[in-house]
């Protein structure tokens, strides 16, 4: 297993400087890093003098982070837990929460975890290594259900064609490897020379989100952060695709009282604002960062500042994703 310090050398957390500037961690500030991963944000927060509770559902991340715990003892506590439960790890409210949504670099780098089509491995994709795998989904769900997953969670334009191909081919040979699935999708859809995005990208995204219930996890995590932040506390969320970013944008919009209005609909009465958003439109990577860290290309940071108002009820309808709310994802 790769040690934490070795990972830190190769791992560059995206939008690190905007995250630190936005969260403004003071010496002694209590911060929750809900997505520890390779420890990039946590390490930077600790160096700024903060006290950090870092969560990750991936046991590999927790194991690899023990050297960091020793280095920064007693200011770092690592907990194997989903970030949707972050309000259960402290009794007092905190100064900041940071969430880096999606798959981590170290998960993508390890072929045996089955997250990447660029490195052949078992069709797994489980962050916590419990529950059903991506292979289970691909080999057992009906084509209409696969198409729904690919279309909604991956925003894949060829969702139906890909789902029907999978249903037909798995009768002869089940999909067991990431390379098998990626090759089959590329053979079906085709790929023009110079195409930067592999045709299997959105399908792999959709499967990963479904297997790990990432949409439900994000929604519950936003509500949990609202409950646990002090007045003036800051919530930062880094997302990597439009579905996640729309959820975060909508959350801050509704919680700030600036919900999407329409001249065709009656005015919506809103509760007292629990957040006000910073940096309208969010923050994306600078040209300098893009050159140093290409992974930051699709990243967007949104930050909200907690008000003194009481936390509001957790209502999934807020996100306008009724068709997604029925997905149980990794809870099966």
Curated annotation (Swiss-Prot):
It is found in: Cytoplasm. Keywords: Cytoplasm, Methyltransferase, rRNA processing, S-adenosyl-L-methionine, Transferase. Its EC number is 2.1.1.199. One of its GO terms (molecular function) is rRNA (cytosine-N4-)-methyltransferase activity. The keyword Cytoplasm applies. S-adenosyl-L-methionine binds at residues 39-41, 56, 83, 100, 107. NCBIfam families: 16S rRNA (cytosine(1402)-N(4))-methyltransferase RsmH. This is Ribosomal RNA small subunit methyltransferase H. It comes from Bartonella grahamii (strain as4aup). The gene is rsmH.
């Amino acid at each position: 297993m790769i040690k934490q310090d070795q990972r830190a050398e190769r791992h560059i957390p995206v939008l690190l400087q905007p995250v630190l500037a936005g969260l403004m961690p003071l010496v002694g500030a209590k911060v929750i890093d809900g997505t520890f991963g390779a420890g990039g944000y946590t390490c930077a927060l600790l160096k700024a003098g903060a006290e950090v509770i870092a969560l990750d559902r991936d046991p590999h991340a927790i194991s690899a982070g023990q050297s960091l715990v020793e280095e920064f003892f007693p200011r770092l506590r690592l907990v194997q837990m989903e970030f949707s439960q972050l309000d259960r790890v402290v009794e007092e409210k905190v100064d900041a929460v940071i969430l880096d949504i999606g798959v981590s670099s170290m998960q993508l780098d390890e072929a045996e975890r089955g997250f990447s089509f660029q490195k052949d491995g078992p069709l797994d994709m489980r962050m916590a290594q419990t529950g059903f795998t991506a292979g289970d989904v691909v080999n057992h769900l009906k084509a209409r259900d696969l198409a729904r997953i690919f279309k909604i969670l991956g925003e894949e334009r060829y969702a139906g064609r890909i789902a029907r191909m999978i249903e037909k081919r798995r009768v002869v040979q089940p999909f067991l490897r990431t390379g098998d699935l990626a090759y089959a999708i590329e053979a079906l859809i085709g790929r023009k020379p110079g195409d930067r995005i592999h045709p299997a990208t959105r399908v792999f995204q959709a499967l990963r989100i479904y297997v790990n219930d990432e949409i439900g996890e994000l929604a519950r995590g936003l509500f949990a952060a609202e409950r646990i932040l002090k007045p003036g506390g800051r919530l930062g969320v880094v997302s990597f695709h439009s579905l996640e970013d729309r959820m975060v944008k909508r959350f801050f919009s509704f919680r700030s009282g600036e919900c999407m209005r329409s001249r065709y609909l009656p005015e919506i009465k809103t509760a007292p604002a629990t957040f006000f958003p910073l940096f309208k439109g969010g923050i994306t990577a600078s040209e300098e960062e893009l050159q140093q860290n290409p992974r930051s290309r699709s990243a967007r940071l949104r930050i909200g500042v907690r008000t003194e108002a009481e936390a509001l009820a957790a209502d999934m309808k807020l996100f306008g994703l009724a068709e997604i709310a029925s997905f149980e994802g990794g809870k099966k």
